[in-house]
């Protein structure tokens, strides 16, 4: 493998054996591609905004004299960039401008004569834009739109599995689900009649729909039944014989023909009998007259002479009727062929219960069911039925729905109209009847072929269309009003409904979620999440077990491990690593093609439905060098089952062992040794890890760390290769390689880094460069590390030296004992940034004012504020300190004489304002790192706001001029090269000032052209700089667009440094979580023979019952990795020659049986080897991919190489006594995470505080400053102990005895420790509730 200069800094040793056929795809593509489809212009008009416009336009007036046509649209440039939007609290969006054409036709002239055409561009609101990382900035906060897994449109056949009716009879149903429009359900009832429901309303006999489609009874019977024809010849009854229909029946008479008896009366008719009848070509047999009684006629029979109806279609024949028919000359009688086995009489029975007999009565019946209580008219009934399923405005199956519909009915073509046809409805009924007759299977709703993904783009398009439809109604009205000659398109369109619909979706839809930004992994996982909840999806309460369960089709599409615990389990899932959606929105996963038993590198993506037709081998099947399967029998999956197949039956093979799991689960090493429940917790808890002060790469990883860190967008990644020309904490400049430059550009890339900003979860986002001056970089190299990344690898926690042993009960029940060294070295110190805002409003009594002049506040409290009343940057503040001084006007009250006097002496200001300053919340302390002041347009800016503005302008100017200098330098170096190659002497050139270079002329025409081109560029560059500076200046100095009634907003940012402490929650990656019970002095910790103490002591009893053995293997492998690092460290300290170092590192990389990774250190220079060794000092990072990891033997070999005992256990000594523990202890390195459940955020105590209004009991919870509930069971405990006085105190003065508690307070102040309990308020509430029921209850005074 070829490594770039940056990648050579630290190479992770990979234990993976299976070759990597397919690289991990870009992990955010599901979001970015979907949104791209939404906003990019689609000439076909199938997706996105274009599709929405085409579906609504052209809009015609009611008279048809004019119409508004859609031409095209364009998205403008956003006003602010992403960072500015976040600071200002606005939405990152672009204006949508649509070109519309108003066409007016001549009234008197023949149709289609155009009188006037006007075209105009109309503003249609703002469309939020997606950032490069797949998020949206809505009102200043980053949000993610989660993809939804919903039932695909189409037709589904299902059954109630015998649960509806008490007899346990299975009732089948069919449901046609459109993309938008009414649902159509067909269902059987226990009596086997077929019914229909529209939109889950009252059920009607199914034939009503057919009658409404203008079918007569005869035609209905004709559609669903085969005929049995009887003929009357010579007073004998003959039946046309189709032998196959007799199979399985019992003969009720002798079946004979031509004097030969084929079946005797009372015998069963078998296949042999049928073969004989077919062989002798018997077409008719004679039947006794009684045989026809009870048969059902298939059409109307009329007496030709009188025109009288003898018997109507679907009537049962009797012998009398037969005689009448014979008399009136009908010698041929057609009846319906039915039997109890596979030709049930369901439709015939349904026609009998159908109260309607013609189209009109059917339409009226449907109208009554849809609009109960409204008087039906013929027109209303017809238009309602037309609009239900046959109008393109109201009903759309969509391309997906039509494809699924046609596939389900086994039709050949998969495209068609979006509305239903007569044939569609009849085919669905036919298939449902076939299923009831035992032919065909019902569908599995949980199959991923029947559920599809709706991503951002599609949901945004739907919302946009909703807005457009609202506009359409208004436009129709306007078009019909007249005086069109003066109107322009923009007078027709009101953009409000559109922007309201879009805003509502992005701001408050259930699937638009506040982004989980704890760390890079939680960001990526959130964007790859798939939810079955949300509009048009399931609800938690109604979702049963089946929907939540893992389905065989999840394989490689949805992760079986990562899902929340709790009420949402199984409803919210995560996309697997390699999964993607196809054009229809179904999930598909890649497989390697197998041709004639040889596995090729050809990759095919298969959806769940396609996969069902193939035999697919597992990724861990053994192959030889040519790609043949080694074993004769290979474990494969086929049709959702796993079994053995011979190798020539295999069609496909998995691409990777980690294809089954999601990104989160693929980061757990030795996942294959963990129980699924714990793996689930491990995958979920990695998302809660707080980024530590110094990120530390995991010693034992899975090889996915780099992909996650790069794709999450928290790191700065090189867009093009080049050399590092300049680097400091906030900017990296790359001089681009010649071959990657665009013609005529300066060839400089500038990367501005994010410094100390706040994330959604109040953690700190900060980027630090990890390249040095002069280093070569290639495209895709990581230039700067973000939060939780280390040299471009995800680093959520720290490598800790752990020992598995009990220690004085401090690790009882998953508690964790931590060494003081961890605190001293700041291993788990995290920085949290809080934003506190102070809003100054315009009130009825006058404006609120931000000032340092606050009534009744001492000098000390104002010491940290400047003269504008805003805290200084760098001030250290604690709970209760004033950050921003603010006073609010107070209502005039009746003044006492004393106050009047004070007023008279000291003037007005004395008492008409109250202090409403922004203070630091209780329990929070930190350092002020930034202050932002936003002032409404037209409000005078205070001194502090002007200072901040001045500073921002200076900074912007400095940044831009530095950028300009860098770009100029790049440009002039190219100009110099052209001049020198054109014959100008270098020395003379360097003496000339640079501005004069461009005035020189060259004889060589081509060089002169190049020079002129560069000169043009130079002018453009300066012009661009001026434009940028002006835009920046305008943005900084202009007033802010604040909410109505708001004059000023001051935002203060506090940085809080949190060390690890008892009560914080920690976890490993295997679901092994615990709470810190004690921080132990280093000298008391167990230590080994070299005197190295352990950092963390874990309880060994946490392993066996939880079955997450992965943590033990990780510990051993971590020990080996550290051992190798220690040896390299020793060699570096002894300054051994590079050759020895190179040889040892090479041995470490080569270790392991047939691993895929080949690191060849002979291609590294000595400097590169030394730098690699420097980065391996703290341990050699190791990758052990999921399901393809290091084997036990390989771990032992690695331990041996590091001169460590192969058992992984060492002798430890007690730190307090120095005595040896009685048996060796497992010690190693485990990657531990500090989770975002910190004791500082949770600890809370109350003395007195707020009370509930009704019950007068203290509130609960930290947010309300509430108390701890003394509940039912606690009361029982006190009762059981007979602690009567304590109990009385708990139920009265400490809770809701209002008078008692105020008296108690007074008593304590007076030093009199007595209580006088009275009546608890909640008892009064009970009395009131009983009285409200009309029962008078009174308490007697004794």
Curated annotation (Swiss-Prot):
Broadest EC class assigned to this enzyme: transferase
Entries under InterPro entries matching the protein: DNA-dir_RNA_pol_bsu_ext_1_sf, DNA-dir_RNA_pol_bsu_external_1, DNA-dir_RNA_pol_su2, DNA-dir_RNAP_su2_dom, DNA-dir_RNAP_su2_hyb_sf, RNA_pol_bsu_bac, RNA_pol_bsu_CS, RNA_pol_bsu_protrusion
Pfam families reported for this sequence: RNA_pol_Rpb2_1 (PF04563), RNA_pol_Rpb2_2 (PF04561), RNA_pol_Rpb2_3 (PF04565), RNA_pol_Rpb2_45 (PF10385), RNA_pol_Rpb2_6 (PF00562), RNA_pol_Rpb2_7 (PF04560)
Family to which this protein belongs: Belongs to the RNA polymerase beta chain family.
Known catalytic reactions: RNA(n) + a ribonucleoside 5'-triphosphate = RNA(n+1) + diphosphate
The entry's keywords: DNA-directed RNA polymerase, Nucleotidyltransferase, Transcription, Transferase
Example GO molecular function: DNA binding
Any single GO CC term annotated in Swiss-Prot or TrEMBL for this entry: DNA-directed RNA polymerase complex
HAMAP family in the cross-refs: RNApol_bact_RpoB (MF_01321)
EC assignment: 2.7.7.6
Gene3D superfamilies to which the protein is assigned, alphabetical: 2.40.50.100, 2.40.50.150, 3.90.1100.10, 6.10.140.1670, DNA-directed RNA polymerase, beta subunit, external 1 domain, DNA-directed RNA polymerase, subunit 2, domain 6, RNA polymerase alpha subunit dimerisation domain, RNA polymerase Rpb2, domain 2
GO biological process, one term: DNA-templated transcription
The name this protein goes by in its record: DNA-directed RNA polymerase subunit beta
């Amino acid at each position: 493998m070829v490594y770039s200069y940056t990648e050579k800094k630290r190479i992770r040793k990979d234990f993976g054996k299976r070759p990597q056929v397919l690289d991990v795809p870009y992990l955010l593509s599901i979001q970015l591609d979907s949104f791209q489809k939404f906003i990019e212009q689609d000439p076909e008009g199938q997706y996105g905004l274009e599709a929405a416009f085409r579906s609504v336009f052209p809009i015609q007036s009611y008279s048809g004299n004019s119409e508004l046509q859609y031409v095209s649209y364009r998205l403008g440039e956003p006003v602010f960039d992403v960072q500015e939007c976040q600071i200002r609290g606005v939405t990152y969006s672009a204006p949508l401008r649509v070109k519309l054409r108003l066409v007016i036709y001549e009234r008197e002239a023949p149709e289609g004569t155009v009188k006037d055409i006007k075209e105009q561009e109309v503003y249609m609101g703002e469309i939020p834009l997606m950032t490069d990382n797949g998020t949206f900035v809505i009102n200043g906060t980053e949000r993610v739109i989660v993809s939804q897994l919903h039932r695909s449109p189409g037709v589904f056949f299902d059954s109630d599995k015998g649960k509806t009716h008490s007899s346990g009879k299975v009732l089948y149903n069919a449901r046609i689900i459109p993309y938008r429009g009414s649902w159509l359900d067909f269902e059987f009832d226990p009596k086997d009649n077929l019914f229909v429901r529209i939109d889950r309303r009252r059920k009607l006999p199914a034939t009503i729909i057919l009658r409404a489609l203008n079918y007569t009874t005869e035609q209905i019977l004709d559609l669903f039944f085969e005929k049995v024809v009887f003929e009357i010849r010579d007073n004998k009854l003959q039946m046309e014989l189709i032998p196959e229909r007799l199979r399985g029946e019992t003969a009720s008479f002798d079946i004979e023909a031509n004097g030969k008896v084929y079946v005797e009366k009372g015998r069963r008719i078998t296949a042999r009998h049928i073969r004989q009848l077919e062989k002798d070509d018997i077409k008719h047999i004679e039947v006794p007259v009684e045989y026809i009684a009870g048969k059902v006629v298939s059409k109307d029979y009329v007496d030709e002479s009188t025109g009288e109806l003898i018997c109507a279609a679907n009537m049962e024949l009797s012998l009398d009727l037969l005689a009448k028919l014979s008399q009136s000359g009908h010698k041929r009688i057609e009846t319906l062929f039915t039997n109890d086995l596979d030709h049930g009489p369901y439709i015939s029975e349904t026609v009998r219960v159908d109260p309607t007999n013609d189209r009109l009565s059917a339409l009226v019946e449907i109208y009554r069911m849809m609009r109960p209580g409204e008087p039906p008219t013929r027109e209303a009934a017809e238009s309602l039925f037309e609009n239900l399923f046959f109008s393109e405005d109201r009903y759309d199956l969509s391309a997906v729905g039509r494809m699924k519909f046609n596939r389900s009915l086994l039709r050949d073509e998969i495209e068609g109209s979006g509305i239903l046809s007569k044939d569609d409805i009849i085919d669905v009924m036919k298939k449902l009847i076939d299923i009831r007759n035992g032919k065909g299977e019902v569908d599995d709703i949980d199959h991923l072929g029947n559920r599809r993904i709706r991503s951002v783009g599609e949901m945004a398009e739907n919302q946009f269309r909703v807005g457009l439809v609202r506009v359409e109604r208004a436009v129709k009205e306007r078009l019909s009003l007249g005086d069109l000659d003066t109107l322009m398109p923009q007078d027709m369109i009101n953009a409000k409904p559109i922007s309201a619909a879009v805003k509502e979706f992005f701001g408050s839809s259930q699937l638009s979620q506040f982004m989980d930004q704890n760390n890079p992994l939680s960001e990526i996982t959130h964007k790859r999440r798939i939810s079955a909840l949300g509009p048009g999806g399931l609800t938690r309460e109604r979702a049963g077990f089946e929907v939540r369960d893992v389905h065989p089709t999840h394989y490689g599409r949805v992760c079986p491990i990562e899902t929340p615990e709790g009420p949402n389990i199984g409803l919210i899932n995560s996309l697997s690593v390699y999964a993607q959606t196809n054009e229809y929105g179904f999930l598909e996963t890649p497989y390697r093609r197998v041709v004639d038993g040889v596995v090729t590198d050809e990759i095919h993506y298969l959806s769940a439905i396609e996969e069902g037709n193939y035999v697919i081998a597992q990724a861990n099947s053994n192959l030889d060098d040519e790609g043949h399967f080694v074993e004769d029998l290979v474990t494969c999956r086929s049709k959702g089952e796993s079994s053995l197949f011979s190798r020539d039956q295999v069609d496909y093979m998995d691409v990777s062992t980690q294809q089954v799991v999601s990104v989160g689960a693929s980061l757990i090493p030795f996942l294959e040794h963990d129980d699924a429940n714990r793996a689930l917790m491990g995958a979920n808890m990695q998302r809660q890890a707080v980024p530590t002060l110094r990120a530390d790469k995991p010693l034992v990883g899975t090889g996915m760390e780099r992909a996650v860190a790069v794709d999450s967008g928290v790191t700065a990644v090189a867009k093009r290769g080049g050399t590092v020309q300049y680097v400091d904490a906030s900017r990296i400049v790359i001089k681009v390689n010649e071959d990657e430059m665009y013609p005529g550009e300066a060839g400089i890339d500038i990367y501005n880094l994010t410094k100390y900003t706040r994330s959604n979860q109040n953690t700190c986002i900060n980027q630090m460069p990890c390249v040095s001056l002069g280093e070569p970089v290639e495209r895709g190299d990581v230039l700067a590390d973000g939060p939780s990344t280390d040299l471009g690898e995800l680093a959520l926690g720290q490598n800790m030296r752990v020992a598995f042993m009990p220690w004085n009960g401090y690790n009882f029940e998953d508690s964790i004992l931590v060494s003081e060294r961890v605190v001293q070295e700041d291993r788990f110190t995290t920085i949290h940034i809080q934003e506190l805002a102070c809003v100054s409003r315009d009130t009825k009594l006058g404006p609120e004012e931000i000032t340092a002049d606050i009534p009744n506040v001492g000098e000390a409290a104002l010491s940290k504020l400047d003269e504008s009343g805003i805290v200084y940057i760098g001030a250290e503040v604690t709970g209760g300190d004033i950050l921003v001084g603010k006073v609010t006007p107070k209502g005039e009250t009746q003044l006492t004489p004393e106050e009047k006097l004070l007023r008279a002496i000291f003037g007005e200001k004395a008492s008409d304002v109250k202090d409403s300053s922004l203070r630091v919340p209780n329990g929070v302390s930190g350092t002020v790192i930034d202050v932002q002041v936003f002032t409404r347009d037209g409000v005078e800016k205070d001194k502090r706001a002007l200072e901040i503005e001045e500073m921002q302008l200076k900074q912007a100017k400095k940044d831009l001029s530095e950028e300009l200098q860098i770009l100029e330098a790049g440009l002039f170096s190219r100009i110099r090269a052209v001049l020198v190659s054109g014959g100008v002497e270098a020395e003379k050139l360097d003496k000339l000032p640079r501005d004069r270079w461009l005035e020189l002329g060259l004889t060589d025409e081509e060089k002169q052209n190049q020079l002129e081109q560069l000169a043009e560029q130079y002018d453009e560059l300066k012009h661009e700089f001026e434009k940028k500076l002006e835009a920046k200046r305008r943005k900084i100095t202009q007033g802010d667009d604040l909410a109505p009634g708001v004059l000023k907003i001051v935002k203060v940012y506090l940085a809080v440094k949190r060390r690890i402490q008892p009560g914080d929650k920690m976890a490993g990656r295997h679901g092994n979580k615990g709470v810190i019970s004690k921080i132990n002095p280093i000298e008391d910790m167990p230590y080994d023979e070299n005197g190295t103490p352990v950092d963390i002591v874990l309880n060994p009893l946490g392993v066996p019952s939880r079955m997450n053995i992965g943590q033990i293997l990780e510990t051993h492998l971590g020990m080996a990795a550290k051992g190798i690092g220690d040896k390299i460290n020793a060699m570096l300290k002894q300054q051994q020659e590079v050759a020895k170092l190179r040889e040892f590192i090479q041995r470490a990389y080569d270790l392991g049986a047939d691993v895929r990774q080949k690191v060849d250190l002979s291609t590294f220079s000595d400097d590169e080897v030394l730098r690699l060794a420097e980065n391996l000092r703290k341990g050699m990072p190791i990758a052990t991919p999921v399901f393809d990891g290091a084997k036990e033997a390989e771990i032992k070999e690695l331990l041996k190489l590091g001169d460590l005992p192969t058992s992984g256990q060492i002798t430890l000594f007690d730190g307090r006594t120095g005595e040896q523990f009685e048996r060796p202890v497992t010690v190693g390195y485990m990657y531990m995470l500090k989770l975002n459940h910190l004791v500082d955020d949770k600890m809370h105590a109350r003395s007195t505080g707020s009370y509930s209004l009704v019950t007068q009991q203290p509130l609960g919870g930290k947010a309300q400053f509430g108390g701890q509930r003394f509940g039912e069971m606690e009361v029982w405990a006190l009762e059981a102990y007979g602690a009567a006085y304590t109990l009385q105190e708990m139920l009265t003065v400490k809770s809701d005895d209002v008078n008692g508690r105020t008296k108690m307070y007074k008593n304590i102040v007076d030093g009199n420790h007595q209580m006088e309990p009275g009546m608890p308020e909640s008892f009064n509430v009970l009395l009131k509730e009983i009285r409200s029921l009309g029962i008078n209850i009174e308490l007697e005074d004794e």
